[in-house]
Amino acid sequence: MTRTALLTIPRISPIVSIAPTANKPMIVSTKGRYALRVMVDLAQRDREEYVPLKEIAEKEGISQKYLEAIMTTLSKAGFVDAVHGKGGGYRLNRTADSYTIGSILMLTEGSLSAVACTAKGAAACSRSTCCEALPMWERLDRMINEFFNGITLADLLKDRETEQ
């Protein structure tokens, strides 16, 4: 069992949960990473054709059951069209340049905040009026959101083509 310690900075409430390894990155969940991979995969394909779940799962190395839950989330949010049955599958319903990475990650993550106290819908922190670090965390959140909202699926495809 992994134990998690809280980093406490003097005069500031516990703000960051750190696992025993000091080089732990800020985390985007597996669901978020897989959703992004699937959206990139679909963006590389013909928008008129439906791609079977099994084909996507095999190409991306994701279990069909887990992928089905992700695709349901994407479909309900209007990110993809879904057709069930023979000849069915999934496809993007807009051009790749109309999907931002931020919108995909916000859908799957709920928040891209670096700390819990700045997350959308978080309960007001009792220290927010006297927390010297709060403006810094809020700036970081804005930077993260601006970064991810400034990149589209089309940008990722172009960047990949440029590298090759």
Residue ranges and their predicted role:
Residues 1-25:
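Short, intrinsically disordered or compositionally biased N-terminal tails of bacterial proteins
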Residues 71-72:
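Short, hydrophobic-biased segments on the C-terminal half of alpha helices
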Residues 78-87, 91-93:
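Beta-hairpin "wing" of winged helix-turn-helix
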Residues 76-79, 107:
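Residue cluster at the C-terminal edge of the helix-turn-helix DNA-binding motif
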Residues 66:
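Residues in the helix-turn-helix
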Residues 93-164:
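Non-DNA-binding regulatory cores of transcription-related proteins
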Residues 28-30, 34-63:
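N-terminal helix-turn-helix DNA-binding core of bacterial DNA-binding proteins
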Residues 58, 75-76:
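Alpha-helical residues within the helix-turn-helix
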